Protein backbone atom coordinates (compact mmCIF):
# COMPACT_ATOMS: atom_id res chain seq x y z
CA UNK A 1 0.00 0.00 0.00
CA UNK A 2 1.15 3.54 -0.83
CA UNK A 3 -0.24 6.53 0.97
CA UNK A 4 0.70 10.11 0.13
CA UNK A 5 -0.07 12.73 2.76
CA UNK A 6 -0.21 16.52 2.33
CA UNK A 7 2.12 16.68 -0.66
CA UNK A 8 2.75 20.27 -1.77
CA UNK A 9 5.12 21.57 -4.44
CA UNK A 10 5.55 25.04 -5.91
CA UNK A 11 7.66 26.46 -8.69
CA UNK A 12 8.28 30.09 -7.76
CA UNK A 13 4.81 31.59 -7.17
CA UNK A 14 2.99 28.74 -8.93
CA UNK A 15 1.61 26.10 -6.51
CA UNK A 16 1.49 22.96 -8.65
CA UNK A 17 0.55 20.46 -5.92
CA UNK A 18 -1.53 21.70 -2.98
CA UNK A 19 -1.78 19.23 -0.07
CA UNK A 20 -2.35 16.15 -2.24
CA UNK A 21 -3.54 13.05 -0.36
CA UNK A 22 -4.00 9.66 -1.96
CA UNK A 23 -4.07 6.04 -0.94
CA UNK A 24 -3.33 3.15 -3.29
CA UNK A 25 -3.81 -0.43 -2.12
CA UNK A 26 -1.54 -3.30 -3.17
CA UNK A 27 -2.55 -4.56 -6.62
CA UNK A 28 -4.37 -1.36 -7.57
CA UNK A 29 -3.78 0.17 -10.97
CA UNK A 30 -4.36 3.91 -10.81
CA UNK A 31 -4.38 6.43 -13.64
CA UNK A 32 -4.17 10.17 -13.12
CA UNK A 33 -5.83 12.14 -15.89
CA UNK A 34 -5.88 15.93 -16.09
CA UNK A 35 -4.97 18.70 -18.54
CA UNK A 36 -1.35 19.50 -19.37
CA UNK A 37 0.53 21.50 -16.79
CA UNK A 38 -1.57 20.47 -13.79
CA UNK A 39 1.12 18.56 -11.90
CA UNK A 40 0.88 14.90 -12.93
CA UNK A 41 4.58 14.66 -13.79
CA UNK A 42 5.54 16.65 -10.71
CA UNK A 43 3.50 14.29 -8.52
CA UNK A 44 5.34 11.23 -9.88
CA UNK A 45 8.70 12.95 -9.60
CA UNK A 46 8.00 13.91 -5.96
CA UNK A 47 6.86 10.38 -5.09
CA UNK A 48 10.08 8.98 -6.58
CA UNK A 49 12.23 11.68 -4.92
CA UNK A 50 13.37 13.23 -8.19
CA UNK A 51 11.78 16.52 -7.07
CA UNK A 52 11.72 17.66 -3.46
CA UNK A 53 8.35 19.11 -2.36
CA UNK A 54 7.90 21.78 0.31
CA UNK A 55 6.02 19.22 2.40
CA UNK A 56 4.57 15.74 2.22
CA UNK A 57 5.01 12.18 3.39
CA UNK A 58 4.87 8.79 1.73
CA UNK A 59 3.92 5.67 3.65
CA UNK A 60 4.94 2.49 1.88
CA UNK A 61 5.51 -0.97 3.28
CA UNK A 62 4.90 0.30 6.80
CA UNK A 63 7.67 2.89 6.52
CA UNK A 64 7.01 6.64 6.55
CA UNK A 65 9.31 8.85 4.49
CA UNK A 66 9.36 12.64 4.68
CA UNK A 67 9.43 13.49 0.97
CA UNK A 68 10.50 17.07 1.69
CA UNK A 69 13.94 15.92 2.84
CA UNK A 70 16.63 13.84 1.21
CA UNK A 71 17.84 11.28 3.69
CA UNK A 72 18.67 7.61 4.01
CA UNK A 73 15.01 6.53 4.20
CA UNK A 74 14.17 8.32 0.95
CA UNK A 75 16.99 6.47 -0.80
CA UNK A 76 15.65 3.18 0.57
CA UNK A 77 12.21 4.15 -0.72
CA UNK A 78 13.64 4.79 -4.20
CA UNK A 79 15.16 1.30 -4.22
CA UNK A 80 11.70 -0.29 -4.04
CA UNK A 81 10.15 1.92 -6.72
CA UNK A 82 10.58 1.66 -10.46
CA UNK A 83 9.75 4.46 -12.86
CA UNK A 84 9.33 4.59 -16.62
CA UNK A 85 9.61 8.14 -17.87
CA UNK A 86 7.76 9.84 -20.71
CA UNK A 87 11.14 10.00 -22.46
CA UNK A 88 12.65 6.56 -22.11
CA UNK A 89 16.29 7.54 -21.59
CA UNK A 90 17.69 4.48 -23.34
CA UNK A 91 21.42 4.37 -23.97
CA UNK A 92 21.78 4.85 -27.73
CA UNK A 93 25.02 2.86 -27.99
CA UNK A 94 23.67 -0.13 -26.09
CA UNK A 95 21.37 -2.87 -27.37
CA UNK A 96 17.93 -3.52 -25.92
CA UNK A 97 19.42 -6.31 -23.79
CA UNK A 98 22.27 -4.09 -22.55
CA UNK A 99 19.79 -1.32 -21.69
CA UNK A 100 17.76 -3.69 -19.51
CA UNK A 101 20.91 -5.09 -17.86
CA UNK A 102 22.22 -1.59 -17.12
CA UNK A 103 20.09 -1.03 -14.04
CA UNK A 104 20.62 -4.44 -12.49
CA UNK A 105 22.93 -4.67 -9.52
CA UNK A 106 23.71 -8.38 -9.77
CA UNK A 107 26.53 -10.42 -11.28
CA UNK A 108 26.84 -10.19 -15.06
CA UNK A 109 25.82 -13.77 -15.79
CA UNK A 110 22.62 -13.54 -13.76
CA UNK A 111 21.74 -10.07 -15.09
CA UNK A 112 21.60 -11.41 -18.65
CA UNK A 113 19.07 -14.10 -17.71
CA UNK A 114 16.92 -11.59 -15.82
CA UNK A 115 17.09 -9.07 -18.66
CA UNK A 116 16.15 -11.69 -21.27
CA UNK A 117 13.19 -12.82 -19.14
CA UNK A 118 11.88 -9.26 -18.85
CA UNK A 119 12.38 -8.57 -22.57
CA UNK A 120 10.37 -11.71 -23.26
CA UNK A 121 7.70 -10.57 -20.82
CA UNK A 122 7.18 -7.34 -22.80
CA UNK A 123 7.37 -9.04 -26.20
CA UNK A 124 10.85 -7.79 -27.10
CA UNK A 125 13.03 -10.93 -26.77
CA UNK A 126 13.60 -11.15 -30.53
CA UNK A 127 14.84 -7.53 -30.52
CA UNK A 128 17.47 -8.04 -27.79
CA UNK A 129 20.42 -7.20 -30.09
CA UNK A 130 18.87 -4.11 -31.67
CA UNK A 131 19.86 -0.56 -30.78
CA UNK A 132 17.24 2.03 -29.78
CA UNK A 133 17.56 3.88 -33.10
CA UNK A 134 16.30 0.73 -34.83
CA UNK A 135 13.26 0.42 -32.55
CA UNK A 136 9.93 2.21 -32.85
CA UNK A 137 8.79 4.50 -30.05
CA UNK A 138 6.51 1.78 -28.71
CA UNK A 139 9.32 -0.77 -28.77
CA UNK A 140 11.63 1.63 -26.94
CA UNK A 141 8.93 2.10 -24.33
CA UNK A 142 8.67 -1.68 -23.86
CA UNK A 143 12.46 -1.88 -23.34
CA UNK A 144 12.18 0.87 -20.71
CA UNK A 145 9.36 -1.05 -19.00
CA UNK A 146 11.46 -4.25 -19.07
CA UNK A 147 14.34 -2.31 -17.49
CA UNK A 148 12.06 -1.11 -14.67
CA UNK A 149 10.53 -4.58 -14.16
CA UNK A 150 13.98 -6.23 -14.04
CA UNK A 151 14.61 -4.44 -10.75
CA UNK A 152 11.55 -6.18 -9.24
CA UNK A 153 10.09 -2.98 -7.78
CA UNK A 154 7.30 -3.13 -5.25
CA UNK A 155 5.84 0.03 -6.78
CA UNK A 156 5.97 0.83 -10.50
CA UNK A 157 5.33 4.40 -11.65
CA UNK A 158 4.61 4.87 -15.36
CA UNK A 159 4.68 8.33 -16.90
CA UNK A 160 2.55 8.54 -20.05
Model-derived regions: residue spans:
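The feature captures the beta-strand-to-loop junction immediately N-terminal to the Walker
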Residues: 33-35
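Helix-to-loop junction immediately C-terminal to a conserved catalytic motif
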Residues: 48
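Conserved ABC transporter NBD signature motif
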Residues: 56-66
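ABC ATPase NBD coupling module
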Residues: 65-82, 106
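Conserved ABC ATPase signature
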Residues: 131-135, 139
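A short, proline-enriched helix->beta-strand linker immediately N-terminal to the Walker B motif
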Residues: 150-154
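Catalytic Walker B motif of ABC-type/P-loop ATPase nucleotide-binding domains
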Residues: 156-159
Amino acid sequence: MLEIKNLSKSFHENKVLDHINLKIEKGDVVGIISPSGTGKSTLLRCINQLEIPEEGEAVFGGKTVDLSKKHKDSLEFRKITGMVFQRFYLFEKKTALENVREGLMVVQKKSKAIALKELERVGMASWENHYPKHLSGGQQQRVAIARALALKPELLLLHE
